[in-house]
Structures are given as structure tokens and as C-alpha cells.
């Protein structure tokens, strides 16, 4: 796609090419929750260190979900090495920025989660979620509070997860993963009316999932249909 845009071939926009070649695959893998693909991401050739950090952030998140602690810790170590490189360059301020601190704290949370240190993981992620709620997100950031909810749900704390998803959705409304997993958490917590609400909202926001084969939408559609049939 980028090769078809000749205006990006020189000047400032040329320098943005590694950024977009990195960012698009990273967020596609994370948003589709394709953890194996996210864990296999590699920096784009020629990327500056401040761009490559995004790859290792995504890998740490993925390895956290996959419970691959050694790999998650290696991702964190490489991220830290890149921060050292950034501090030596002309854009050293990036290493001390709030969004970098949020990314780094999220990685610490996922490393702890992968290592089975649930309480530490929850504490780290709750702290960073509170910070992010105050300062706001970058344009396509994954809400840290949604990550906290993911951890709680994957650890069997459905009711707590539901509460965190609900807070996340107030700040980042209509996110597919937020709505779907709020529905999952509600189901697991035995709150079928809330599950129905979140799944129905998901169906509405995706045009009933007509143009998608994602299993999340299939599950939500089936749940809504069964619940509506039972009510009639």
C-alpha cells in the first residue's frame, strides 16, 4: 500500500514509512488478538529505535497472553536496550515521555502475568490504567484498563473483569474487544442480561457482523438470538 503512494518517497513523509510499516501490523495483530502473529513480529529494516520499541511492546503483550515468560522478559530487555539508544539520540525526550512510561509499565504487567505472578500483574496494570485514564490515550492505543480486564478474565475473576471492561468502555466506547469481552465476562459471572446488552451493542456497532467471519461475532450473534428466542 505504501509503495503505491509516491508522495511518501521523499522528505518528512519518507521518514514515516518505517513507522507505518511497523504500526499497522502491530495493531492488526493485537486488535485481532492473534497472539502468535504478534509474538513473531520483527522490527522493519531501517527502523529507528523509537519505532522498534512498538514491536517489542506488542511481543511482550502477546507472550504475556501466551504465558511465555522467558520470551516476554526478553522482549522487555530488548525494549530497555532500545530506550538506551533513544536517550543517546536527538529524540531522547521520547524515552522519558508519558506514553513510553505507559508502554513500559504495561510490559512489566504482562511479564509478571506470564510468570504467574497474578497479584503483581494486576497491581502493575491497575496503576498504569489509572495513569492512562488521567492523561488520555494516543490515537490507537489499546486501553490499559481493557488489558487489566483481560488479565482478570483469563485468571477466572469474571466479575472483577466485567467491572473493568465497563470502565474501559466508558472511556473508549464501542471497542469490539471491549464489548465482546464484557459480554464474555458477564456470561462467566452469570449476568446474562448484561451479556445480552454487550453482545447486542456489539452486533449493532458492527452491522450485525455481516461482513466478518470473526468467531467473536458469531458467538455474540448466537447468544443474542438464543436469548431473544427464549424471551418470546
Question: What is each residue range found by the language model?
Answer:
Residues 1-4, 73-84, 176, 187-211:
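TPR/TPR-like (Sel1-like) alpha-helical repeat modules
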Residues 2-15, 41-50, 80-96, 129-137, ...:
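Solenoid-like repeat scaffolds
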Residues 18, 52, 94-97, 101, ...:
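Residues that mark the junctions of alpha-helical repeat units in TPR/alpha-solenoid scaffolds
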Amino acid at each position: 500500500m505504501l509503495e503505491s503512494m509516491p508522495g511518501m518517497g521523499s522528505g518528512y513523509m519518507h521518514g514515516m514509512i518505517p513507522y507505518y510499516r511497523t504500526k499497522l501490523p502491530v495493531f492488526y495483530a493485537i486488535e485481532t488478538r492473534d497472539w502468535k502473529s504478534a509474538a513473531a513480529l520483527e522490527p522493519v529494516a531501517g527502523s529507528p529505535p523509537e519505532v522498534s520499541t512498538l514491536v517489542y511492546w506488542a511481543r511482550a503483550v502477546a507472550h504475556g497472553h501466551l504465558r511465555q515468560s522467558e520470551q516476554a522478559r526478553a522482549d522487555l530487555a530488548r525494549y530497555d536496550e532500545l530506550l538506551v539508544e533513544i536517550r543517546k539520540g536527538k529524540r531522547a525526550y521520547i524515552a522519558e515521555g508519558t506514553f513510553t512510561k505507559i508502554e513500559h509499565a504495561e510490559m512489566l504487567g504482562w511479564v509478571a502475568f506470564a510468570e504467574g505472578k497474578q497479584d503483581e500483574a494486576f497491581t502493575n496494570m491497575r496503576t498504569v490504567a489509572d495513569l492512562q485514564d488521567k492523561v488520555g490515550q494516543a490515537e490507537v492505543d489499546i486501553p490499559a484498563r481493557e488489558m487489566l480486564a483481560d488479565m482478570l478474565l483469563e485468571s477466572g475473576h469474571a466479575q472483577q473483569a466485567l467491572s473493568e471492561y465497563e470502565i474501559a468502555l466508558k472511556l473508549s466506547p464501542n471497542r469490539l474487544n471491549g464489548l465482546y469481552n464484557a459480554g464474555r465476562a458477564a456470561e462467566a459471572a452469570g449476568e446474562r442480561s448484561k451479556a445480552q446488552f454487550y453482545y447486542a451493542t456489539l452486533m449493532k456497532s458492527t452491522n450485525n457482523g455481516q461482513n466478518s467471519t470473526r468467531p467473536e461475532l458469531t458467538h455474540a450473534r448466537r447468544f443474542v438470538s438464543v436469548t431473544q428466542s427464549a424471551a418470546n
